[in-house]
Every structure is written in C-alpha cells, then in structure tokens.
Amino acid sequence: MHVFYFMKITLDLLRAHVGKVINESRSPAGNWLQLTLAAVEKGKASISVLVRKEMCNPFGHIHGGMMSLVIDEAIGWAIISLEAESHYTSLNLNVDFLYAAPEGETITAVANIVRQGKKIVHAEVHVYDSKQTLLAKAASNLIVTGMKIINS
C-alpha cells in the first residue's frame, strides 16, 4: 500500500510525486489510467496520460468517456492540492470535445480551481496533445461531502 491510502495528502507530498506515475492512489480508476502527475501547486494540477488501445473508440481515438475520466482525475488532483479536511464529489461535469487524440498520443489535462466556496468548488480543465492542440475543455462543480479525510 502507498502513503496516498493512509494519510491526508499535503501539497509538499504531492510535489514530491511530480514526474512520477501514480498507480497506488485511493482512486482505482485513476490507478488504471497510469497517469503521471506533471505539475502541482495550490489549486492547480496537471496530469499526463498515454492513450492506450483499451481507451479508444472503434476509430482508434480516445473514447469520450475516457477523456472525461482523465478530466475528472485532473480535477481530483487539483482538489487534493487544496489540502481540504473533507472529500468532495462531483455535482456535474460539462465537457466540450474539440479534437480527437489517437492511440499512442500523450495527453495532458490542466485543472484549475476557479472558486472555492464553503461548500462548492468550481474547476476548469483544458486537455492538450503533445503539440499543444486544445483537445477538450471542461468545467465542473463539486460539493464537500462531510466525509473526513484520514489523517495519520
């Protein structure tokens, strides 16, 4: 088991994992993505993901649901960077798909917490390919659940 399972994650701990593949987090779906934490600061996170065959639609491009998963994971890491005391859950996720990414492409999702209220957080994400083409943009509102984050 990895430390991400057992403790409240601090910004310093996140920074120590920049450039590394995250495959032992609390998120089984995120672990499956084999994402790399590309950058992190308070309220912002970037993740990179290699588009694998099992992520693709019949045309050989990333499936919209997979793109949404990448976006949701990026938001999750940006939320974690806030060092909140409680978990958040999504109220909505609105995605504009602009261009497709083929199998073998590495995509980068850049998440930014635009507003953090007492109960609601608003996040925005842009997803780029290796040529910096904007592939998708998204916005999400999340609500604090009241479930406390384990702190050991």
Where are these regions (language model features)?
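Terminal targeting signals and extreme-terminal segments of soluble enzymes
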Residues: H2-S152
